[in-house]
């Protein structure tokens, strides 16, 4: 595994946390000191909000930082049907027994992973409420169905991504949610950085990458 795993179903086996470790360093070209800011947040056990447009490198940045910090990365792609049980866990029938299966958030809290909630604004508001006690100094995860409250281990880190340009009356983050996170701003990289990224990812020379980007920018109407 080289880029972490996206969690779509609850995972209950704690030994499976190693499946979320990133084996090879993902390439990332730092732009505005974001590596240092994220490192400070991780050391201080602070949650982080990555703000920026779609396609500006937020997900690759999280993968890069998970590798640098040596922590597992559990990615959850948020959507309007995502429930609190999808994140926390649920009881499932297994043979003749009913067993509890941890969700990705619970697994990360117990095992010290970075849990990345991608495009958090897509999730229902009643779902995002469960991250509030995790995103302040309590660092607690209530599991109502089990009558338990779990305290996050030191290496657990909560990261969310948010596109400020994608807002409506129905879809936006509450201020009470935003203010709990250290915000790191992202934007599309400058041409020289973008050329380096394309050259590395496509395995072409810098000159070829620059020519490719000219074509793309012309097509998108970007300067």
Residue ranges and their predicted role:
Residues 1-223:
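C-terminal regulatory/interaction module of P-loop NTP-utilizing enzymes
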């Amino acid at each position: 595994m080289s880029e972490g795993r996206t969690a779509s179903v609850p995972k209950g086996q704690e030994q499976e946390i190693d499946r979320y470790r990133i084996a090879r360093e993902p390439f990332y070209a730092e732009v505005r000191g974001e590596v240092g800011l994220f490192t400070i947040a991780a050391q201080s056990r602070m949650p982080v909000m990555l703000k920026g447009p779609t396609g500006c490198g937020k997900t690759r940045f999280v993968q890069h930082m998970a590798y640098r910090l040596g922590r597992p990365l559990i990615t959850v792609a948020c959507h309007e049907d995502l429930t609190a049980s999808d994140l926390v866990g649920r009881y499932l029938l297994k043979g003749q027994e009913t067993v509890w299966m941890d969700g990705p958030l619970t697994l990360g809290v117990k095992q010290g992973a970075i849990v990345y909630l991608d495009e958090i604004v897509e999730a229902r508001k009643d779902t995002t409420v469960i991250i509030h006690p995790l995103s302040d100094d309590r660092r607690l995860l209530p599991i109502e169905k089990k009558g338990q409250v779990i305290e996050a281990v030191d290496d657990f880190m909560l990261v969310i991504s948010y596109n400020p340009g994608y807002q409506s009356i129905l879809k936006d983050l509450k201020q009470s949610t935003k203010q709990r996170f250290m915000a790191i701003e992202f934007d599309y990289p400058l041409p020289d950085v973008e050329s380096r990224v394309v050259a590395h990812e496509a395995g072409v020379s810098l000159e070829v990458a620059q020519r490719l980007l000219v074509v793309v920018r012309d097509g998108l109407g970007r300067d």
